[in-house]
Design a protein with these regions (language model features):
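Ligand-binding beta-strand-loop-alpha-helix segment within the catalytic cores
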Residues: 126-217
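Glycine-rich phosphate/diphosphate-binding loops that line cofactor/substrate pockets in enzymes
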Residues: 50-64, 200-204, 248-258
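C-terminal functional extensions of proteins
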Residues: 42-45, 268, 275, 282-350
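Glycine-rich anion-binding loop/nest that anchors nucleotide
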Residues: 64-73, 93, 209-213, 233-308
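N-terminal glycine-/serine-/threonine-rich phosphate-binding loop
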Residues: 24-90
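A generic, well-ordered mixed alpha/beta core segment in the N-terminal half of proteins
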Residues: 85-152
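Short acidic, glycine/serine/threonine-rich loops at helix termini
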Residues: 76-79, 104-110, 220-224, 273-276, ...
Length: 350
């Protein structure tokens, strides 16, 4: 009887069990609680507003593209981006060739990376010494050339050559997916597989575009094999084919609530895919094609001297990319700080 009264008594007029479940539910959203309590003004408030907008877009049935510029994979954003992919909070990714490969480099060579927290104090000789040790620096993080690049190279080259021998052609990300799903890299794994966004993407067969892939380590390696006559450039599908691939996907997926655009950084990873809308509208004369239906950019770039990456979202209206009514957000801050918080909020609420 005592147990009965304990479970079914009221607390402030609320049944005890309902009170407890509400507390548990509230406690299960620590990031939401934190940012809604303390992130109240300026860029902090913009972060909250943009996160809420992302959640609302998904709840209304919309789809979302995330674009990755900078060194997000080396920053290990994959730890939380992988979960976003697994939980269906992202439907398409556009990234640089560096982000495509550096997630896998971290996967197979993590223990060989070196942090250089005092990087601002390095002399030219210090930088040369890092080079001679086979370490390529990205701000405070050094990527080990032999363990990272070469471990991938010997396997990806085999896959390139095998495809060419069969007369097959694939996109850069499709070749990476083949390598991941073949299992040949598992012998090298140095981080939990759930922390790799590329593994999550490969397993979900997530659509990806990699504009300017040639500007990457694997792109350079592929070019070297073409120069040596061991591969044909046509074995790798081109950037133009990436645009037609994206155009087909956008046309099929932009109905209803439409597709949102979540841009991390600037550069080609964002510039390339956002142009699919004006291309379809103006060049294909598809006048019923919807604009991007949500827009957010995290960037430390400012509007000056013709900077496209630092342009305010409204400028994109003049280019036929966003509508007047498109929810628009810009968080002028460091993506390595903001993106994990925003993704955590989205995972807790969407």
């Amino acid at each position: 009887m005592l147990l009965y009264h304990t479970f079914f008594r009221c607390v402030d007029g609320i049944p005890f069990l309902s009170f407890i479940f509400a507390k548990i539910k509230k406690m299960s959203k620590p990031i939401t609680e934190f940012i809604e309590k303390y992130y109240l003004h300026f860029n902090a408030a913009a972060l909250v507003d943009a996160s809420k907008g992302y959640v609302a877009h998904l709840k209304d049935g919309g789809k979302m593209m995330i674009t990755l510029a900078g060194a997000m994979s080396t920053a290990e954003l994959g730890k939380i981006l992988a979960e976003m992919i697994r939980q269906g909070k992202v439907d398409f990714i556009s990234c640089t060739g560096a982000n495509l490969e550096e997630d896998l480099m971290n996967l197979v060579a993590h223990s060989h990376y070196e942090r250089v927290p005092h990087y601002r104090d390095l002399t030219a000789q210090d930088e040369w010494d890092l080079l001679e040790r086979g370490l390529n620096r990205v701000t405070d993080t050094c990527i080990p050339e032999e363990e990272a690049f070469r471990r991938l190279q010997k396997h990806i080259v085999e896959i390139w050559k095998d495809a060419e021998a069969k007369g097959e052609r694939y996109f850069p990300h499709e070749f990476m997916y083949k390598m991941i799903l073949s299992g040949v890299l598992e012998q090298y794994y140095e981080i939990p597989r759930e922390n790799s966004w590329m593994i999550a993407a490969a397993e979900a067969n997530l659509p990806i575009v990699v504009p300017g892939w040639e500007d990457s380590t694997m792109g350079n390696i592929f070019a070297s094999y073409c120069i040596k006559g061991e591969l044909k450039a046509t074995t790798m599908k081109s950037g133009i084919e990436y645009m037609t691939y994206l155009a087909d996907w956008y046309t099929k997926n932009s109905g209803g609530k439409g597709v949102g655009f979540f841009q991390i950084g600037g550069g080609i990873a964002g510039d390339f895919p956002i142009c699919v809308v004006p291309m379809l509208y103006q060049d294909m004369e598809m006048h019923d094609i919807p604009f991007w239906s949500y827009f957010c950019q995290i960037s430390d770039s400012t509007t000056s001297y013709g900077s496209y990456s630092g342009a305010v979202p409204n400028e994109k209206i003049t280019w036929g990319k966003l509508d007047i009514t498109t929810p628009k957000f810009i968080v002028e801050s460091d993506a390595t700080i903001c993106a994990p918080l925003m993704f955590s909020y989205i995972l807790e609420n969407a």
